[in-house]
C-alpha cells in the first residue's frame, strides 16, 4: 500500500513537471503566432482605413454629381415648353426698329428665334464665351462711338470660337476671308495668320462695319454687306431699287443673317427669361493678357519665351493662335503674354537679343 502511494506521488510529480514544461513550450510557440496575428490585424485595419477613405471620396464625388444633376433637372423642369416663349413685341438692332408689324418679317425672326432656343447647348456656350470676349469688344465699341449691338455680329459669325474656319476659308472670331483680312491689316503667310488674332481682328471688324455703315447709311444693310460683301449689296440695291434690308431679295444665308444677330441680342440680353441659367463660376474667365510689340531680325522661339516667363508652351500657343509655327517670325509683331509676365519677358528678350548680336 505504501509502495502504491509512493508510485502515485512520483507519477503526480512527473505529470506536474511535464505539464509545466508543456505550458512553457506552448507559450513559446504561441508568442510568434500572437505577433503574426497582431501584424495581420494591423495590416487589415490599415487596408480597411484606406478602403473607407476611398469610399468616402467616391461618396463625396457622387454627392457633387447628385447636386449638379438635381440642379440641371430643376432647370429643365423650370423651363417651360418651347412653344411658350414669345418674341418681344418690339425689337431694335443698333437703334433701328425691326418692322415686326410686317408678318413676313415677324415670321422670319420667329423662325430664327425658335431654332436658336432649341439649341440649348449652343446658347450656354454663347453665354460662357461672351464673358470672355464681350468686355473687350464692348470697350472698343464705346471708344469708337459705335452701337453696342455690333458685338452680336461675332456671335452669329463664329459663336465666339477663336479657331473657327468656314468652308469658304473665313477664319477667326470675326470670320474674315483672306482678301478682306489683308485690306484691314491682317497679315497671312506660312508663319502667321492674323485673322486668328482676336484683338487685331476686332479692330478690323469694327472698322469694316463702320465703313459699311458710312456707305449704306443703315446698320442692318452694313451687317448684310459684312456677310455677303459690299459689291453684292450694291448690285442688289441698284437692281431692286430698294434700300431696306428687310425688303431686299438676297442670298438665303444673308436673308437669315441679320435676323440671327437680332435673336442673339434678344436671348443674351436676358437669358434667364428664356430658361438659361448659369452661376458665376460656370462662365469662362475673361480675356486677361499683356500684349507686347517686338521687332525681330531672327525668329523668336516660343518655347524659350514660355520657359523664361514661367508658363507652358501650350499656354503661349493658345494665347497666340495667329502664330502658326514654333517661333515668332522676323519682322514687327504683337505677342500676347499671361498677365503679370511682361517684365520677365523683356529681361529674357533683351538678353536673347544681345546674345544674337554677340555672335
Spans of model-derived segments:
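N-terminal secretory signal peptides that target proteins for export/translocation
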Residues: 1-3
Amino acid at each position: 500500500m505504501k509502495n502504491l502511494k509512493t508510485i502515485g506521488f512520483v507519477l503526480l510529480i512527473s505529470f506536474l513537471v511535464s505539464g509545466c514544461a508543456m505550458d512553457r513550450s506552448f507559450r513559446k510557440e504561441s508568442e510568434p503566432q500572437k505577433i503574426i496575428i497582431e501584424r495581420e490585424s494591423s495590416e487589415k485595419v490599415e487596408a480597411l482605413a484606406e478602403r473607407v477613405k476611398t469610399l468616402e471620396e467616391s461618396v463625396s464625388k457622387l454627392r457633387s454629381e447628385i447636386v449638379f444633376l438635381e440642379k440641371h433637372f430643376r432647370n429643365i423642369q423650370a423651363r417651360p415648353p418651347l412653344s411658350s416663349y414669345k418674341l418681344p413685341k418690339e425689337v431694335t438692332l443698333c437703334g433701328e426698329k425691326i418692322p415686326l408689324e410686317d408678318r413676313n418679317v415677324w415670321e422670319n425672326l420667329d423662325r430664327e428665334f425658335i431654332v436658336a432656343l432649341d439649341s440649348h447647348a449652343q446658347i450656354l456656350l454663347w453665354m460662357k464665351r461672351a464673358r470672355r470676349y464681350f468686355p473687350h469688344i464692348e470697350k472698343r465699341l464705346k471708344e469708337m462711338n459705335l452701337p453696342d449691338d455690333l458685338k452680336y455680329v461675332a456671335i452669329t459669325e463664329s459663336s465666339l470660337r477663336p479657331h473657327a474656319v468656314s468652308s469658304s476659308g473665313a477664319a477667326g472670331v470675326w470670320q474674315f476671308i483672306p482678301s478682306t483680312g489683308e485690306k484691314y491689316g491682317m497679315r497671312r503667310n506660312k508663319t502667321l495668320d492674323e485673322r486668328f488674332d482676336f484683338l487685331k481682328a476686332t479692330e478690323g471688324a469694327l472698322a469694316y462695319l463702320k465703313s459699311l455703315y458710312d456707305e449704306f447709311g443703315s446698320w442692318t444693310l452694313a451687317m448684310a454687306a459684312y456677310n455677303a460683301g459690299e459689291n453684292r449689296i450694291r448690285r442688289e440695291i441698284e437692281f431692286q431699287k430698294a434700300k431696306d434690308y428687310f425688303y431686299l431679295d438676297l442670298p438665303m444665308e444673308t436673308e437669315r443673317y441679320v435676323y440671327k444677330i437680332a435673336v442673339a441680342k434678344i436671348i443674351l440680353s436676358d437669358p434667364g427669361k428664356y430658361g438659361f441659367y448659369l452661376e458665376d463660376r460656370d462662365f469662362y474667365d475673361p480675356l486677361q493678357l499683356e500684349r507686347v510689340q517686338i521687332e525681330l531680325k531672327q525668329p523668336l522661339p516660343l518655347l524659350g519665351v514660355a520657359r523664361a516667363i514661367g508658363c507652358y508652351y501650350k499656354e503661349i500657343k493658345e494665347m497666340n493662335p495667329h502664330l502658326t509655327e514654333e517661333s515668332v517670325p522676323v519682322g514687327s509683331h504683337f505677342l500676347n503674354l499671361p498677365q503679370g509676365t511682361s517684365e520677365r519677358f523683356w529681361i529674357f528678350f533683351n538678353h536673347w537679343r544681345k546674345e544674337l548680336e554677340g555672335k
